[in-house]
Amino acid sequence: VNGVTPPAVQHLTAEVTADSGEYQVLARWDTPKVVKGVSFLLRLTVAADDGRERLVSTARTTETTYRFTQLALGNYRLTVRAVNAWGQQGDPAS
């Protein structure tokens, strides 16, 4: 297997702010070590009225912060995991 398995994401926090009736979330996280070529996959879901999770947004970034905007009030779950250039994924945080 090529490369080093990406490190687990840790210390995931989300700061929510209101903006004209909509909400935005600034997510921050880190990893125990820096690995070259790692990016982060983000998956934001919301609890639907029927109790199931509905996908709201996905994103990929090389930063350790990401801002989601124009969100309605709701019960959200954010999952973040590191992925290397070969597609290997580290343990997620949510």
Regions found by a protein language model. Name each.
Residues 1-36, 72-73, 85-94:
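Pro/Thr/Ser/Gly-rich low-complexity, intrinsically disordered linker/stalk tracts
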